[in-house]
Amino acid sequence: MTKQLKLSALFVALLASGTAVAGEASVQGYTVSGQSNEIVRNNYGECWKNAYFDKASQGRVECGDAVAAPEPEPEPEPAPAPVVVVEQAPQYVDETISLSAKTLFGFDKDSLRAEAQDNLKVLAQRLGQTNIQSVRVEGHTDFMGSDKYNQALSERRAYVVANNLVSNGVPVSRISAVGLGESQAQMTQVCEAEVAKLGAKVSKAKKREALIACIEPDRRVDVKIRSIVTRQVVPAHNHHQH
């Protein structure tokens, strides 16, 4: 083959090769290896771009010519299930506060002592709370004296205490008073037995004094309180939800 023909053949081969590379490069914007089909890099690890490269449309992240798309935001965790609070039906709570007649009144008297006024004022503050449903004031006496006398004395004492509580702010609509006389005296037999042990040498006056002291718990005013309590309860299965 002549020298001219050899040159012509080489030119055609180069031209064909160049066309192929150019055609492939024009699609990707980078010089691509015909063997591995991967972007050719120089000694510095940089991607080789060709004349057809357009950064806006062809830039690649691995070549530093594009910014990676942000990762999608993680799905928010589902909100915890609301805690259901069940309000129970109102319940009644009954309580009795026993006030010694000795601290409230003089013996056989129905007028309040000075120190009793202060104690009843404190009690009235509690009885004025909104959850108090009702207040029943019960007057009691010991067995000494006639039934009729004791009944009247117990009523007077109950009314005196109830009126004092009302004057200190307890709503009159929730308070009542009743006298029960000696009907609920509990110390009679015990105290009579104790006094009998004193023997014949002890005078009647001393025995009477001892008996009066012994049956002192029967001389009392009971304040019976009924309160309404409403409790809020979280069902057990709510504690296991996450």
UniProtKB/Swiss-Prot annotation:
<comment type="similarity">
    <text>Belongs to the outer membrane OOP (TC 1.B.6) superfamily.</text>
</comment>
<keyword id="KW-1134">Transmembrane beta strand</keyword>
<dbReference type="GO" id="GO:0009279">
    <property type="term" value="C:cell outer membrane"/>
</dbReference>
<dbReference type="InterPro" id="IPR006665">
    <property type="entry name" value="OmpA-like"/>
</dbReference>
<feature type="repeat" description="5">
    <location>
        <begin position="77"/>
        <end position="78"/>
    </location>
</feature>
<dbReference type="InterPro" id="IPR006690">
    <property type="entry name" value="OMPA-like_CS"/>
</dbReference>
<dbReference type="InterPro" id="IPR050330">
    <property type="entry name" value="Bact_OuterMem_StrucFunc"/>
</dbReference>
<keyword id="KW-1015">Disulfide bond</keyword>
<keyword id="KW-0812">Transmembrane</keyword>
<dbReference type="GO" id="GO:0015288">
    <property type="term" value="F:porin activity"/>
</dbReference>
<keyword id="KW-0472">Membrane</keyword>
<feature type="repeat" description="1">
    <location>
        <begin position="69"/>
        <end position="70"/>
    </location>
</feature>
<keyword id="KW-0626">Porin</keyword>
<feature type="repeat" description="7">
    <location>
        <begin position="81"/>
        <end position="82"/>
    </location>
</feature>
<feature type="repeat" description="6">
    <location>
        <begin position="79"/>
        <end position="80"/>
    </location>
</feature>
<feature type="domain" description="OmpA-like">
    <location>
        <begin position="92"/>
        <end position="229"/>
    </location>
</feature>
<feature type="repeat" description="4">
    <location>
        <begin position="75"/>
        <end position="76"/>
    </location>
</feature>
<dbReference type="InterPro" id="IPR006664">
    <property type="entry name" value="OMP_bac"/>
</dbReference>
<keyword id="KW-0406">Ion transport</keyword>
<feature type="repeat" description="2">
    <location>
        <begin position="71"/>
        <end position="72"/>
    </location>
</feature>
<dbReference type="Pfam" id="PF00691">
    <property type="entry name" value="OmpA"/>
</dbReference>
<keyword id="KW-0813">Transport</keyword>
<dbReference type="InterPro" id="IPR036737">
    <property type="entry name" value="OmpA-like_sf"/>
</dbReference>
<feature type="repeat" description="3">
    <location>
        <begin position="73"/>
        <end position="74"/>
    </location>
</feature>
<feature type="region of interest" description="7 X 2 AA tandem repeats of X-P">
    <location>
        <begin position="69"/>
        <end position="82"/>
    </location>
</feature>
<feature type="disulfide bond">
    <location>
        <begin position="191"/>
        <end position="214"/>
    </location>
</feature>
<dbReference type="GO" id="GO:0046930">
    <property type="term" value="C:pore complex"/>
</dbReference>
<keyword id="KW-0998">Cell outer membrane</keyword>
<protein>
    <recommendedName>
        <fullName>Outer membrane protein class 4</fullName>
    </recommendedName>
</protein>
<dbReference type="GO" id="GO:0006811">
    <property type="term" value="P:monoatomic ion transport"/>
</dbReference>
<keyword id="KW-0677">Repeat</keyword>
<feature type="signal peptide">
    <location>
        <begin position="1"/>
        <end position="22"/>
    </location>
</feature>
<keyword id="KW-0732">Signal</keyword>
